[in-house]
Amino acid sequence: VEWTDAEKSTISAVWGKVNIDEIGPLALARVLIVYPWTQRYFGSFGNVSTPAAIMGNPKVAAHGKVVCGALDKAVKNMGNILATYKSLSETHANKLFVDPDNFRVLADVLTIVIAAKFGASFTPEIQATWQKFMKVVVAAMGSRYF
């Protein structure tokens, strides 16, 4: 993927405003609530049976931060996102057996959470650039599935 300077700047600016400790837990919790079938991957997280339990679950919050930490690596390695996610993709494909469509679901929900947080400043133009970036991340996360 070729990134223009404007796209790189936009993605860095959006990500620079993201509080990983806030957005990560909110995004993962929303995925588990809105798409309940994703809960099957988090059996070791304890109670994820209700929205309140999910929102208050410290393991969900911690993993949401981990997810955003991994996204931070993509922002910092925009020239080689595929290589950046090679190992993570292999783990999700071959050890965790995560349906790769869930990466798209998470990307969409993360975008919704960011848009809700940033409000009108998350313009359609910024969203278009952000979603291009997320599509590249989703493709990289699915790259080791055979």
From Swiss-Prot:
- Give the UniProt tissue specificity note: Red blood cells.
The Globin domain sits at 2-146
**rRNA processing as UniProt keyword:** no
Task: Output the Gene Ontology terms for molecular function.
Answer: haptoglobin binding; heme binding; metal ion binding; organic acid binding; oxygen binding; oxygen carrier activity; peroxidase activity
Return the CDD domains for the record. Hb-beta-like
Q: Which residues does the record give as heme b binding sites?
A: 63, 92
User: Keywords on this record?
Assistant: Heme, Iron, Metal-binding, Oxygen transport, Transport
Naming one, the record's GO cellular component terms include: blood microparticle
Q: How does it assemble?
A: Heterotetramer of two alpha chains and two beta chains.
Q: Which family does it belong to?
A: Belongs to the globin family.
- What this protein is called in its record is Hemoglobin subunit beta-1
Q: Which organism is it from?
A: Oncorhynchus mykiss
> Which gene carries the instructions for this protein?
hbb1
